[in-house]
Amino acid sequence: MAFDFPDQFRFADSHEYVRQEAELVRVGLSAYAVDQLGDIVFVDLPEVGDDLSRGTSFGTVESVKAVEEMYAPITGKVIQRNEAVLANPEELQNDPHGEGWLLVIRPSELAQIEELMDSATYSAKVAAA
């Protein structure tokens, strides 16, 4: 299955994406990862105000197939979480790159974004998987 990964996104090896929005960053799970999980039944996210460290677990996503950890693609503070996805996890499945976003983070270092994969590199990675 072919996936369309937006050019303005950057991706972590663990399949989380970031989209910079001025001084904030929106974080979500890539369409590829969501597809691999199957039917999503539960999402656990950190609280607003929590500090995240790049590469450490910030929550879980549970599907009928598995429970997977999600990892912070960058370091920062949680400014907002998507309450709609918490209440209705199918939203993540329906539109992972849009309304199915997970968190908004105020990054400690915007430069960390550039260390993530661009959409072309990520697309090649998942195509080879």
UniProtKB/Swiss-Prot annotation:
Q: Name one GO cellular component term.
A: glycine cleavage complex
Q: How is the cofactor bound?
A: Binds 1 lipoyl cofactor covalently.
Q: Which PROSITE patterns match?
A: BIOTINYL_LIPOYL (PS50968), LIPOYL (PS00189)
> Which residues in this protein are found as N6-lipoyllysine?
65
Q: Record's SUPFAM superfamilies?
A: Single hybrid motif (SSF51230)
Looking up Pfam families in the UniProt record yields:
GCV_H
Q: Which UniProt keywords apply?
A: Lipoyl
Indicate the quaternary assembly: The glycine cleavage system is composed of four proteins: P, T, L and H.
Q: Which family does it belong to?
A: Belongs to the GcvH family.
Q: Sorted alphabetically, which NCBIfam families does this protein's record hold?
A: gcvH (TIGR00527), PRK01202.1 (NF002270)
Q: Please explain the role this protein plays, according to its UniProt record.
A: The glycine cleavage system catalyzes the degradation of glycine. The H protein shuttles the methylamine group of glycine from the P protein to the T protein.
This chain belongs to the protein called: Glycine cleavage system H protein
